[in-house]
Structure formats: structure tokens, C-alpha cells
Swiss-Prot record:
Record-level GO cellular component terms: plasma membrane
Enzyme class of the recorded protein, top EC level: oxidoreductase
Protein name: 3-demethoxyubiquinol 3-hydroxylase
Species, as recorded: Herminiimonas arsenicoxydans
Residues the entry annotates as binding Fe cation 1: E60, E90, H93, E174
């Protein structure tokens, strides 16, 4: 197994953070929208799709920050590797949503550095509470993200087949990440913390739709 020193790991995370916030992340898998015919959207529908996909892109910026922080401060190598693997898979989502935003003639959230910093802080706190609680944070996060993506599939214009294809694959991946964290011994997040996470998510999604 390749040994990665703490300094090398820091450099990797720093490089990843720069790529995440600058919008130059590269996907390791083809976009689910590849080969899907682009439906005809009027201006209002295009703006609405762009707003929802911007929210989804912000979610992936936050996912990158969370996983990087949790990997950085994980207490065991196995958990660290799981966070790093999930982070690489989530980077696909980041690239896919950024590409779709460009196709819709829009842009990522202007507040991405703020979202990233806040999510990294939350991930650090979760990791410091121990691996079981950190994994539980992943399970709850992925559960909320899955619900949010499924809601978006109902809110996107039905003819926006490209965005729908991306969101559907993202939802399936989130389920897999949550299941993997659960299998590693996740400890459930307390109800009060769940409500706090939902409140933070509401602020983020409402703001990112417009900015």
C-alpha cells in the first residue's frame, strides 16, 4: 500500500480545494448527460434549471470540503481511505454539475469559498468527535442530500433531460456512500443535530439558487 505522508496529504487537499473553488475539477466518469438530447427550455425554465443545478453544485463543493476534512482528521487508516474514495467519486458530481451550468449559460455560486470553508469546519468538528460519529454525520448528510436531489427531480422541467440524468445518478451515488459509511460502524446523529443540519442546508439551498 502506498504510504502518504501527512505533508503530502495536506498538499493534495490544498490542491483539491483550489480546484474545487476555481471550478476546474475533472470527472473520472463520463457525465450521465452525455448522449442525452437537450430539451427545449424557455428563458424562465432555463433560469430555474440553472438555479437548481447551482444548488446541486454547491452541495458538491460542500461534500468535497466535508470529505477532505473528515479524511484529514480520521482516526484510522481504513476510515481515512473510505472518505478519500467517496470524495473522489463526489468530484464527478462537481464536474458534472459545473458542466451542466455552463450548458445552461449560467455560473456556480459566487459564495463557493464561504460554503467550502463552512463545510470544512463542520467536517473537522465531526471528525474530532471520533470515527463512528464522523461516519454517522456522513450517513445523515447523504440521507438529506438524497432527499433534496429527489425533490429536484420533481422540480426540474420535465424536458430538461440532461439535468435530470445528472441528478438521478448523483442520487444513486449518495445512497451508496451512505450505505458504505453505515457498514463501517456509523453512530446515529442526535435528532437535535439533524435539525441543525437541515437548517443550515435550507439557508445554503435558498441562497445558492440565486447567487
Amino acid at each position: 500500500m502506498e504510504y502518504i505522508s501527512p505533508f503530502d496529504r495536506f498538499i493534495r487537499h490544498f490542491d483539491s480545494a483550489l480546484r474545487v473553488m476555481s471550478g476546474v475539477s475533472a470527472a473520472s466518469r463520463p457525465s450521465p448527460a452525455s448522449g442525452v438530447a437537450d430539451g427545449v427550455l424557455d428563458d424562465a425554465e432555463r433560469r430555474h434549471s440553472a438555479g437548481l443545478m447551482r444548488v446541486n453544485h454547491v452541495g458538491e463543493v460542500c461534500a468535497q470540503a466535508l470529505y477532505q476534512a473528515q479524511a484529514q482528521f480520521a482516526h484510522s487508516d481504513a476510515i481515512k481511505q473510505q472518505f478519500e474514495l467517496a470524495g473522489r467519486e463526489e468530484e464527478d458530481h462537481l464536474a458534472w454539475t459545473a458542466q451542466r451550468l455552463r450548458e445552461l449559460g449560467s455560473h456556480p455560486s459566487l459564495l463557493n469559498p464561504l460554503w467550502y470553508a463552512g463545510a470544512y469546519a463542520l467536517g473537522t468538528v465531526a471528525a474530532k468527535l471520533g470515527d463512528a460519529r464522523s461516519l454517522g454525520f456522513v450517513v445523515e448528510t447523504e440521507r438529506q442530500v438524497e432527499a433534496h436531489l429527489n425533490e429536484h427531480m420533481n422540480r426540474l422541467p420535465p424536458q430538461d433531460a440532461k439535468s435530470l440524468a445528472v441528478v438521478a445518478q448523483m442520487s444513486a451515488d449518495e445512497v451508496a456512500h451512505g450505505s458504505a459509511a453505515q457498514a463501517l460502524g456509523a453512530q446515529a446523529v442526535p435528532p437535535l443535530a439533524q435539525k441543525g443540519m437541515q437548517a443550515i442546508s435550507k439557508i445554503m439551498t435558498t441562497t445558492a439558487y440565486y447567487i
